[in-house]
Each structure stands twice: as structure tokens, then as C-alpha cells.
């Protein structure tokens, strides 16, 4: 329903803003080092095109996303089921 879509769009936009604010203060979500917080959150952000919010509107979140997207293990995991998949860029 339109109500449900709008509700969850607002929630997702709020989460983007909170993540962006956090990443303004630190390189990664839990501080200066790459941790399970980043590992668990990145796959959700990798679907940013589905969220229809515009990751490029969040400078710090975009930086974090792109930095993690370049990690060899992340690329390998992203392509695990389909070698032709390309990690979406903002």
C-alpha cells in the first residue's frame, strides 16, 4: 500500500541520515577499525538502489560504502552466487 511504502521510505531515510552522521565522526561504524558492524550493515546498503533514496546525497555514508566495496573479500562475497554481478555505485 502507499501508506506502507511511505512509512518504510521515511524509516530508511532516517537510517541513512543516522549512519551518515555516525560516519562523519569515525571511519567505520564502530570506530576507526572495520568490524562486524560494517560487515553486517554493508549488504543492506548494497541494495541502496532498491531504497530509492540516493546514496550520493550522503557524503560520509557514500565514502564508507565505496571504501568497503573495494575490499577483496566483499567483492568475492558479493559475486558468490553470480560472477557477473557488479557492486552498485552511488
Description of each model-found segment:
Residues 1-72, 77:
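GST-like fold's C-terminal all-alpha helical module
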Residues 74-90:
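Terminal-tail/helix-coil boundary detector
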Amino acid at each position: 500500500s502507499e501508506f506502507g511504502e511511505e512509512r518504510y521510505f521515511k524509516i530508511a531515510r532516517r537510517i541513512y541520515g543516522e549512519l551518515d552522521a555516525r560516519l562523519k565522526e569515525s571511519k567505520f561504524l564502530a570506530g576507526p577499525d572495520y568490524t562486524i558492524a560494517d560487515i553486517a550493515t554493508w549488504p543492506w546498503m548494497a541494495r541502496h538502489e532498491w531504497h530509492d533514496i540516493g546514496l550520493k546525497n550522503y557524503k560520509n555514508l557514500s565514502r564508507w560504502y565505496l571504501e568497503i566495496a573495494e575490499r577483496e573479500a566483499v567483492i568475492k562475497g558479493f559475486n558468490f552466487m553470480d560472477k557477473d554481478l557488479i557492486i552498485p555505485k552511488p
